[in-house]
Structures are given as C-alpha cells and as structure tokens.
C-alpha cells in the first residue's frame, strides 16, 4: 500500500488548525464563558445533568449571533461529536484505522448546559457535605497557567493577613508588631508550588502528607500558633498521596485557617474537593485540555468560605487580577475541553488495566519494581482518604502513577526500552514517561529522598492509546529489562 503524502497546503492548513493560527478573536469571550461553565458544572460532584442540556448552544436562549457559523460551533468542532469505535468509554480504539483528520476525537463530548451565564450550578447536600452553588462568572477565574492561579491564591491570602496586621497595629498600644501567619505545605508538592510558597512567606513544610503530618499540624495548632492557610495537592505529585481532607476541614473550622487545594492531578471529574476547600486551583493545561497545544489555569472560590467576600472584591481589583488568558488559547482550550469528562473516564480505566494486568505482577522483592504509587496502591491511608472525597458517579483514581526500582540500572533500562513519548507534562492525550526526581530535583536529590521521592522514580501519565497497545509497550519494556 502506497502511503499518501500530504501536500504543503494541507500541511499548512493542519498546522494552522492544530495550533490556532487561523482563529477569529471575536469568539474568545464566548469561549471563556463556556470554559467557566464547564468548570463550574464539575467542580461540585453532581450526579445528573439537566435534561435540556446541550453541547454548545441551547435553542431559545441565545441571540441571533449565536446561530451563525462560528468557530465555536463550526465543522471544525464536529470532530468532537464522534463515538467510541466500540461504543464504550473503556473500550479500545483500533489504532490501524485511518484517521479522518488531525482534529478527530474518538470520544464523545460531555453535555454542557448552555442556558444563561448567570445561572448557577448546584448540588444537593450529601453525606454531610454542604450544598454549594457556584456561579461561573462570579466564582471561576481563568489564568494563563496553573501556577499563576496558585500564586494569585497565595497572594490573596497574604493580602488578607496584611489587613489583619494593619488592624492589630492601629488598635494596639504595644510597640511590637504581630507576626505574619505562616503557610503550611501539606505533602510533597509540585516543585514550583513548593518554591513559590516558600519564596513569598514563611512556611511549615509537612512533606510526608500523611497521618504523621496531620499530627504535626495539630501539634502546631495546639501550641497556640495561628497559621494562615494549608496548601494541599489532591493527590500529591509524584507520590500520589492523599491527605485527610475531612480532618483538615475540621481543623480549619476549629482554628480558623484556610484550605487551598490544587486538584490538577486528581481532576474535578474524580475528586470532589470544593466542599473541603476555600479555594480550588488547577492547571487546565493537563487533562482538561489534553491536546498539549495550549496552557491555562483556573481558580474557583467556595461561596461558603469565610474569605469569599474578601476574595471576590480582591479579584475585581484591576491592580490585583487581570484575565491574561490569551484569546486564541481560550478558543482552543474550549475546543479541547469539550470531551474532558469522557477522556478522564477512559484514562481511569486504561490506567487501572495497565496496573492490574501488566505492572502489579512485577512488584515485590526479587522483582523489577520496588513499589507502584497510585491512589489505590500507595497506602491504605491514601485509599481511604481518597475514597472519602471521590466523585460518586464518574470518579476514578486518575491517569498518573509512579514506579520505583530496586536497581538503578534496571530503572535506566526500563526507561530506555519504554517506547513512549518522554516529557515533563501530564494529562496529555498521549502517554508520557518522565524520570521525575532526576529532572525536577537534580540539585536537591537528598531533600527529595528525605520525603520518599527516590532518585530512580519514574512517573507515567497515561493517555488515550488503546489498552492493548499500552499493555504491549509496557510488557516489552519489562521483558527486555529483566533480561539484563
């Protein structure tokens, strides 16, 4: 069979469509509205969608301009309306089938309600969690990156604390000023998060992120010291540990600190974190987008938080917050995220298949792998804590896991024999392998190992490849490595 070559014109058209060089800027605001709607709908665990929900525009609720052939509902988006080849989320895609074009997705998009923008999403009270109503336009904020959202959340709380200090100074006769409250980093986080939080405030770094860290936090609080906030990843990167959010919430109500969750690794499809947080941050670059052609971040305010009114005013100040998500990025982020629920569910299934059928038999003494880090494998404590906040309907354990090895040579050989894309991101539609510790903490290896992040740790982010293909790739890498 002679392979058909693309013409230069076709290649140019594909690149322009794929990387957003032919977009109409006029639709950027509409794209941002849809992104916020999408986040607001899933940031609260909600079992059922309204019967009248539609993918993009709901007839009868839009003006005439919405019915014109725009980028947001043009033929380019028809690629997102395809069905799985086998009719199911967890089924495998025939990798030999000729693709229709560069924009085709084999996974159907999730329904997104397109009624009025001001309509709020709600969830009924369940298992002791308070009902929440999140307004997309008032409570969801977009950023050019996930780290920008975390930095802004931290700066917001530092500003809150500075007002407390000013009130204390103005109302006190003593000459000494009250100290700034410290920030607690709970668990071993993404490297940039650690450096940002430590660089802009005094911190307690409780890197274990388990029951021992909770006891240490409780000891600090009972000593009489007030803390500003606890930052926690759900779960942590790269050890996939999960702290006890219910206990953190109880302590926050008792001692008056705030909780900021970074749910990038778990994702809003899998984790119902907002009821236990004052602010939820996320990188939209990862699973929410998936296509690896756009960067973005989000921040969601909990309307029931003590800091909500202050945070809402803070985010309206031009000197404090500006929506810097580039217009073309917003349009492509909207397109990419239409099927993020279906992609997340598929990745959940593929990851558990890969772990159960291929990797777990090779874990243990005198075997290739020393340990697998994954929310249902890291520890019983992590599994219990994760399941307490896992979304009821679609929630799984995510597509990220880490492997450690008994032998450094085996780690290198396995990585070399793993015929996958290699890179530092996660949540992409294609599977990625990354020697996390060496690449991220090369100059701080001893510090990382102190918290269980071994230098030979290999992090895997599972994509949308079929289970059979992934299984074959990993099995071949295992077979070649054990021959050494």
Predicted regions and their residues:
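Conserved C-terminal alpha-helix-loop-beta "cap" of PLP-dependent enzymes
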Residues: 1, 173, 178-181, 359, ...
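PLP-dependent enzyme catalytic core of the Aspartate aminotransferase-like
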Residues: 1-78, 82-84, 91-92, 96, ...
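Conserved PLP-enzyme active-site core in the AAT-like
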Residues: 59-61, 68-73, 126-368, 373, ...
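Hydrophobic side chains in well-ordered alpha-helices
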Residues: 310, 410-414, 470-474
């Amino acid at each position: 069979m002679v392979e058909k070559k693309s013409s230069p014109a076709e290649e140019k058209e594909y690149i322009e469509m794929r990387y957003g060089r032919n977009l109409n800027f006029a639709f950027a605001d509409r794209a941002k509205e849809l992104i916020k709607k999408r986040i607001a709908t899933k940031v609260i665990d909600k079992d059922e969608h309204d019967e009248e929900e539609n993918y993009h525009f709901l007839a009868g609720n839009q003006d005439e301009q919405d019915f014109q052939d725009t980028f947001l509902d043009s033929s380019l988006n028809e690629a997102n309306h395809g069905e799985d080849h086998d009719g199911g989320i967890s089924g495998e895609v025939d990798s030999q089938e000729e693709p229709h074009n560069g924009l085709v997705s084999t996974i159907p998009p999730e329904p997104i309600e397109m009624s009025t923008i001001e309509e709020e999403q709600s969830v009924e009270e369940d298992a002791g969690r308070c009902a929440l109503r999140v307004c997309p336009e008032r409570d969801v904020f977009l950023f050019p990156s996930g780290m920008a959202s975390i930095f802004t959340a931290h700066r917001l709380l530092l500003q809150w604390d500075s007002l407390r200090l000013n009130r204390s100074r103005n109302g006190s006769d003593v000459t000494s000023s009250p100290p700034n409250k410290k920030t607690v980093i709970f668990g071993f986080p993404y490297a940039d998060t650690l450096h940002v939080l430590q660089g802009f405030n005094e911190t307690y770094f409780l890197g274990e992120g388990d029951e021992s860290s909770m006891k240490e936090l409780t000891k600090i609080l009972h000593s009489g010291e007030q803390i500003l906030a606890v930052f926690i990843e759900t779960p942590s990167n790269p050890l996939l540990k999960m702290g006890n959010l219910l206990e953190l919430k109880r302590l926050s109500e008792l001692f008056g600190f705030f909780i900021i969750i970074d749910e990038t690794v778990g994702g809003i499809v899998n984790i119902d974190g907002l009821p236990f947080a004052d602010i939820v941050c996320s990188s939209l670059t990862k699973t929410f987008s998936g296509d690896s052609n756009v960067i973005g971040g989000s921040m969601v305010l909990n309307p029931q938080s003590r800091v909500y009114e202050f945070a809402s005013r803070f985010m309206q100040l031009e000197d404090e917050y500006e929506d810097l998500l580039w217009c073309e990025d917003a349009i492509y982020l909207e397109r990419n995220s239409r099927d993020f629920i279906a992609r997340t569910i598929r990745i959940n299934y593929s990851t558990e298949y890969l772990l159960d059928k291929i990797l777990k038999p090779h874990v243990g003494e005198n075997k290739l792998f020393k340990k697998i880090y994954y929310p249902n494998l890291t520890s019983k404590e992590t599994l219990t804590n994760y399941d307490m906040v896992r979304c009821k309907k679609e929630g799984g354990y995510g597509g990220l896991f880490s492997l450690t090895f008994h032998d450094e040579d085996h780690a290198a050989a396995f990585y070399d024999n793993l015929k996958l894309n290699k890179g530092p991101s996660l949540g992409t539609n294609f599977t990625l392998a990354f020697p996390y510790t060496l690449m991220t903490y090369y100059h701080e290896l001893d510090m990382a190992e102190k918290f269980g992040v071994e230098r030979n740790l290999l992090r895997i982010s599972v994509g949308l490849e079929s289970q059979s293909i992934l299984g074959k790739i990993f099995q071949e890498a295992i077979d070649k490595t054990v021959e050494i």
